[in-house]
Amino acid sequence: MQKNSILFVTLSAFTVFIWYFFFAQPSEQSYRQMMQLQNTVAVSESGVNKFKNADLNEFQIDDIYAKEEHINIETEQYKAVLTNKGGGVLSWSVKEKNGQWVDLVFPESAPVMANFPNLTYKVVSKSAEKIVFEYASKEGWKITKIYNLSDLYMHNLNISVEKNAKTPFPQIDLKWGPGLGTDSKELKENISLTRALVYTAVKPNKLKKLKDNFEPASLCKWTAVDNRYFLVAFIPKNSMDFDKILFSRLEKKHPCSVILKAAEPKDVDKKDYSVNFYLGPKDYKYLKTYDLGLEKTVDFGFFGFLGKIAFSILVFFYKLTHNYGWAIIMLTTIIQILVLPLTLKSFKSSAAMKRVQPVIKDIQTKYKDNPQRLKAEMLNIYQSQKVNPLGGCLPMLLQLPIFWAFFTMLRNAYELRNEGWILWVKDLSAADQFMQFGSFNLNLLPLMMGIGMFFQQRMTTVTSDPTQRKIMYIMPVIFTFMFWSFPSGLVLYWLTNSLISMIEQYFIMKKDAITVKHI
């Protein structure tokens, strides 16, 4: 069994290791430099960053030095700062469960949702529920922007454009980015996790990650920018009002921007554009209540169907315990019970291989100069003893999808954010940070996990093979290093998994020892 256990652990480690380092994280300084660079320009149809509003330049220049006015809105769940410059948003912070605020707008990317940022709008009215901006040009066209605000995360923006017969319609765009704000402790990883998305309107509806412009916009129900835990989505009430979704990312490692570009009206002098917009957390159950497919932005990974099942069971256990830490432990226990038949099958296959090893070694010595005869004799032994040399590996490999689905679900579940377990574990979505020595954080759970893995391998790796013994000592160290800064919810899962595996192996080995005496 020990070889197969080592194989399973090694494959799991390799998978996690590749995944973790695939998302290499830049420094905070380089991230902010990227934000400043990309925000010097905006997105165009070709992906090159510029706005096509040459006909408005003279009015923009006149308004550059006009007085800026800020409108502050605060509710129990969010607080926002809007500006009369472009009628845009300077800041939009949502309140977390621990009472802290997370601003979804980076200062380097503000203002967002602005139309012609250099135009100074008149503030017609303002309240906690409704803000009205208006801009009237000397040429006879007028833009009115009305923010209809709710108490939670879904709001509405209505843009009304009027013109006279001689003037063209100004181009209306709705922009977000570059990037999406997050907690300061997650700033480094945010760049690799920020995505631009569209959700197609044609059934079967699909969530697509943008890598280029998307057109026609009428083929999508909404477009969004998200990161691990937060989402900004634009949902047009009439998708036919919009022409294209423009995407921009200067380089692969840079934050992205999206613009919802309005279609040019035909044969009318007035046009209204209405867009609902969501700014808030990626709470799976909450997003699902909108019935818009927004919950699909929650990443359950390649084995998403398994991740969703695990998530539903996790929430069920949380309702029983009111503690996500205990819910993780209970769910891990259930998973271990479910895969126990595979574990037993793997052990039985390994035990059978162990019993025929002396005979195989004799045959290998006897026919070392005759490969064909050696192969035939070994096949004969496997068939006569009903032994499958791969029988111990396959059950372990079948567990990998379950492991990966659970791992991805815990990694991306907003529900674990700011949820503690016991004592020093205050946030299951962050490293546990038992003690701090200067800039070094002592994380206790990864150490406990590494110690548990060491004793688990020591129980099963009864071998004189020096290579296997080295692996027994090295693997716990590698895993401790890899999981050091991982969310404590993930580490708790792996620690629980190791402890349960040790208990299972103890009883399996004990039973096997009794069985051997009667052979």
Curated annotation (Swiss-Prot):
Gene designation per UniProt: yidC
Cellular localization per UniProt: Cell inner membrane
Subunit structure, interactors included: Interacts with the Sec translocase complex via SecD. Specifically interacts with transmembrane segments of nascent integral membrane proteins during membrane integration.
InterPro entries documented for this protein: Membr_insert_YidC, Membr_insert_YidC_N, YidC/ALB3/OXA1/COX18, YidC/Oxa/ALB_C, YidC_ALB_C, YidC_periplasmic_sf
Free-text function comment from the UniProt entry: Required for the insertion and/or proper folding and/or complex formation of integral membrane proteins into the membrane. Involved in integration of membrane proteins that insert both dependently and independently of the Sec translocase complex, as well as at least some lipoproteins. Aids folding of multispanning membrane proteins.
Transmembrane segments: 6-26, 298-318, 324-344, 390-410, 434-454, 471-491
GO cellular component labels: plasma membrane
Keywords: Cell inner membrane, Cell membrane, Chaperone, Membrane, Protein transport, Transmembrane, Transmembrane helix, Transport
GO terms for biological process, alphabetical: protein insertion into membrane; protein transport
MF terms in GO: membrane insertase activity
Pfam families for this protein: 60KD_IMP, YidC_periplas
Protein transport is among the record's keywords: yes
Protein name from the UniProt record: Membrane protein insertase YidC
Family: Belongs to the OXA1/ALB3/YidC family. Type 1 subfamily.
Native source species: Endomicrobium trichonymphae
Membrane topology: Multi-pass membrane protein
